[in-house]
Amino acid sequence: ILQSGQKLVLEITTRITTSRDIDPLIGSNEISDTYDELFAKSSLAWASRWNESDIEIDGAPDDQSAVRYNIFQLITSCSARDSSVSIGARGLTHTRYKGCYFWDTDLFMLSFFLYTHPEAAKSLMEYRVRTLPQAKENAKKMNNAGARYPWMTSFDGSEQCESWDIGASELHITADIPFAMQQYFDATGDENFHLQAMEAVSYTHLRAHE
């Protein structure tokens, strides 16, 4: 029973996970750190990422803030150790496009991770390798040879574009992906991944030269 003038502080810790990662009921019992301990670990992790990723510019403070805001969005939107997903078109800030993945990741976002967090870049490319079977199936539906990566995909690699004409017309993604894979190899020299990616490159090459 609290006496007059006494204070009671309640500390509530939550954990966000999915059934793909761990049994939620088991995971909820693994939170043993206090808020201060979790905050200290998070601060160290973020300090390390900023040390690797920060970009300083000569310009107005608002411009510097904008650069860092975008870096923050890239880091938080990429699940660096989970190749079953990629980066949603609007990151974690918006529900537009239902969190689906586009070619923007392969051409525009990959470069950032190549030179700041190669492990994350590899994860993004492994997502494309993993979803090659769906790209082959998509090519069959379009009466094409080889593989044709869908315009708008979710975690299972299938076409999610609701507008048939856009999904059917946007062909360049099939060339964008092997280009991105080559960019990754050039930056890292990762021979093991290069061998994994060869099938994807070969099948998209068939589509390009049909």
Language-model features, listed with the residues they occupy:
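Conserved small/polar residues in nucleotide/adenosyl-binding loops
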Residues: 204-210
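Helix-terminus loop motifs that line ligand-binding clefts
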Residues: 78-93, 119-179, 185, 192-195
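Acidic/polar, glycine-enriched structural segments that form the non-catalytic walls/loops
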Residues: 1-96
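Short, charged/polar micro-motifs that form catalytic or ligand-binding hotspots
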Residues: 60, 98-99, 111-115, 164-168, ...
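Aromatic- and histidine-enriched alpha-helix N-cap/loop-to-helix transition segments
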Residues: 65, 99-106, 116, 169-176, ...
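Residue-level preference for non-acidic, small/hydrophobic
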Residues: 5, 108, 202-204
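Aromatic/hydrophobic pocket-lining residues that form the small-molecule binding cavity
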Residues: 121, 201-202
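Alpha-helical support elements that line or immediately flank enzyme active sites
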Residues: 69-74, 105-119, 131, 175, ...
